[in-house]
Amino acid sequence: MGKNVVVLGTQWGDEGKGKIVDLLTEQAKYVVRYQGGHNAGHTLVIDGDKTVLHLIPSGILRDNVKCIIGNGVVLAPDALMTEINMLKERGVPVEERLLISEACPLILPFHCALDIAREKARGNNAIGTTGRGIGPAYEDKVSRRGLRVGDLFDAELFAVKLKEVMAYHNFMLTEYYKCEAVDYEETLKDALAIADYLKSMCTDVSELLDQARKAGEPILFEGAQGTLLDIDHGTYPFVTSSNTTAGGVATGSGFGPRHLDYVLGIMKAYTTRVGAGPFPTELKNEIGDYLGTKGHEFGATTGRKRRPGWLDIVAMKRAVQINSVSGFCLTKLDVLDGLEEVKICVGYQYPDGTVATTTPLAAEGYEKVTPVLETMPGWSESTFGATSVEQLPQAALNYIKRLEELLETPIDIISTGPDRNETMILVNPFS
């Protein structure tokens, strides 16, 4: 029987999920996105050629792999078409490989307008959203007024539903935020223009995945963002609007949770965060600049500079707990090359001197803590491009071993560069 594997980020996103998903899809028949939207940014480097995907699953570059956008993904038709056209220009037969759930909520222009207006109104308290309408689209979903992909296939009914929801949102835009209204006729025309094209790729995702499972075909579920951005378990309110954790697989694709075999947590060898929000181990010094520059820490979606810091074991333990992480993939180990010493956060100290080994449940709690750091010797040798453990310096091996001890979870994959082949798979999640 084939295995069903989840690949997800265990930090604040940007851990290197895209490369690992692309690598593992060699053994998968299906790759499924189950949450988020085009706020994700998954970078693939194959033989030096870089491809950045925001919405379409990272398996799209593989022959004989079906890529699925599940019902938990909020779908912007214009963003999808941009990505499809980019891939088709590169010779990728997208229509043969991509399938979409009719239950995906639609992101429409008024969602983006609302997102931007709200961030502007928050001023110094801005959350740091991508401004791509993700949050407002999820709001419409849970308030049961949202439009879904399947609604596009009845033009008359779609027009009525769109008019109702736009009347509500345009009122908010003009009267509360003092912004311009979004044009109804233009929104309707643009949405219906691609209805038939989308319909040709729609399917019952839950049924398809269940049949694939019964046939023993391996399925890979691709997470977006990271555990610490989860709407429920992240640094609320500085979070995304979906469940980025393993539990989101079942709700976001209709796949039975008992059929998941392995959860691979992607963990950078240090930590980064993009946008606002608490970050106990943040380095606002020359070491932080070194990590940011060497690690090319700029968001694949927004281009924003990421905030670097030491690896936070307290947060990682929470990620292991929430996701039932089977094993880790450690990425960007090579970025630590050249540092005299490396540090790991092993606890959070509060003003009264007590030390916690669990994370607060909201952003406010993080303001009170300072990281308790454990120092280890660094290494001067290069780990870049290493493809076997024997090529790693002893200090790097000691660092990896210490992480495994602290997390009580094995590191099964080590990534030492952006390309597919700059990876060592110690334990294959599909084996």
UniProtKB/Swiss-Prot annotation:
EC code: 6.3.4.4
Q: Which GO terms describe its cellular component?
A: cytoplasm
Coiled-coil segments: none
Primary location recorded for the protein, binned into one broad class: cytoplasm
Report the superkingdom from the record. Answer: Bacteria
**Cofactor note, please?**
Binds 1 Mg(2+) ion per subunit.
Which Gene Ontology terms describe the biological processes this protein takes part in?
Answer: 'de novo' AMP biosynthetic process; IMP metabolic process
The UniProt record gives the binding positions of Mg(2+) as 14, 41
Sites where the protein binds GTP: 13-19, 41-43, 306, 332-334, 415-417
CDD domains named among the record's database cross-references: AdSS (cd03108)
Q: Where does substrate bind?
A: 300-306
Q: Which reaction does it catalyse?
A: IMP + L-aspartate + GTP = N(6)-(1,2-dicarboxyethyl)-AMP + GDP + phosphate + 2 H(+)
Name the UniProt key words of this record, in alphabetical order: Cytoplasm, GTP-binding, Ligase, Magnesium, Metal-binding, Nucleotide-binding, Purine biosynthesis
Question: In Gene Ontology terms, what is one molecular function of this protein?
Answer: adenylosuccinate synthase activity
The similarity comment for this entry is: Belongs to the adenylosuccinate synthetase family.
Assembly with partners or alone: Homodimer.
* Function according to Swiss-Prot or TrEMBL: Plays an important role in the de novo pathway of purine nucleotide biosynthesis. Catalyzes the first committed step in the biosynthesis of AMP from IMP.
| Name the UniProt record assigns to this protein | Adenylosuccinate synthetase
Species of origin = Shewanella pealeana (strain ATCC 700345 / ANG-SQ1)
